[in-house]
């Protein structure tokens, strides 16, 4: 039994390198570069993606790659890259206090009741959570958690939100 336990402990040391994957996922890296790349998809559409290259603080034993929804992660021995698609188009910023807003159908936007009092009643209706928004056009990056503010969505109940990809963000 002692020899068996000794061999187990001895070979467990070989498994410690697997923990280096967790270190990368927990932010143990240095960002080396980031850039916007243009690409042509299989269906012929063009798009952009933001590519971040990082130096791992701890080497990993083997290359590993995975795709989660729109994110693509490739962890190499010493370097990791993350590819995030850039969404270009129009998104909605949803106001949380929709009871304080009117929705203007013709303009497809919500405005605060204090301002909407100057709009004819026939052109306004009480806003609902799903239509209490303003529209914003531009380039956006997706996020699963509300890290970057303000956050935008395609639809009210979408799980993935977006933040605007501003020049300040790209140069920081």
Predicted features, each with a name:
Residues 1-172:
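DEDD superfamily 3′-5′ metal-dependent exonuclease/proofreading module
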